[in-house]
Amino acid sequence: RRLLRDLDIKINQVIPEGGSVKDLKSLPKAWFTLVPYSEVGLMTAMYL
């Protein structure tokens, strides 16, 4: 988060941190998806 803030990049969602099913609707609106661990979210990021 700090690195992205320092680069003046707005964070849309951090999943699963405090996320809900309702929040998931905004995920496709992102310009890009950052996946820090490919084992966990690569397929999801590719889908989005």
UniProtKB/Swiss-Prot annotation:
BP-aspect Gene Ontology terms: light-independent chlorophyll biosynthetic process; photosynthesis
GO molecular function, one term: metal ion binding
UniProt keyword annotation of Transmembrane helix present: no
UniProt xrefs under InterPro entries: ChlB/BchB/BchZ
Cofactor, free-text remark: Binds 1 [4Fe-4S] cluster per heterodimer. The cluster is bound at the heterodimer interface by residues from both subunits.
Domain of life: Eukaryota
Subcellular location: Plastid, Chloroplast
General function of this protein: Component of the dark-operative protochlorophyllide reductase (DPOR) that uses Mg-ATP and reduced ferredoxin to reduce ring D of protochlorophyllide (Pchlide) to form chlorophyllide a (Chlide). This reaction is light-independent. The NB-protein (ChlN-ChlB) is the catalytic component of the complex.
Subunit (UniProt): Protochlorophyllide reductase is composed of three subunits; ChlL, ChlN and ChlB. Forms a heterotetramer of two ChlB and two ChlN subunits.
Protein's recorded name: Light-independent protochlorophyllide reductase subunit B
Native organism: Stangeria eriopus (Natal grass cycad)
